[in-house]
């Protein structure tokens, strides 16, 4: 189980980034309004301000793997985005397997087919819940540049 701290969870998509945060003790997970994507340079100031306002100490990024645990077409994009964001924000990061997280969030919250971003942020909240229960520990981005690493939560429900 990771050390509790204020963390921002991201469910990175091509059009939106679902966001969720937790309190510094890791007790309460809260979905945050999804970010409608632009270029990375447009997203960064919004995420910087959010991290500053919430006193974020680490990032949890969903990594889309298939049912066999293999990277999907979207996984490479998420890896690049997560690393780039962690480096820009100078925050440690952990990856969580997001297989089925969007489906599970849709089922749990009745948000199937939602395009407002609520579904994306509900999925980010599920990822953060899973990370708080199972880890892995946050790592400096420099330690993750070679790949997603062996420490990956096999989450998603």
From Swiss-Prot:
Could be a nuclease involved in processing of the 5'-end of pre-16S rRNA. Its main location: cytoplasm. NCBIfam families: RNAse_H_YqgF (TIGR00250). It is found in: Cytoplasm. One of its GO terms (biological process) is rRNA 5'-end processing. Belongs to the YqgF nuclease family. GO terms for molecular function: nuclease activity. Keywords: Cytoplasm, Hydrolase, Nuclease, Ribosome biogenesis. Pfam families: RuvX (PF03652). Its EC number is 3.1.-.-. SUPFAM superfamilies: Ribonuclease H-like. SMART domains: YqgFc (SM00732). The keyword Transferase does not apply. Gene3D superfamilies: YqgF/RNase H-like domain. InterPro entries: RNaseH-like_sf (IPR012337), YqgF (IPR005227), YqgF/RNaseH-like_dom (IPR006641), YqgF/RNaseH-like_dom_sf (IPR037027). This is Putative pre-16S rRNA nuclease. GO terms for cellular component: cytosol.
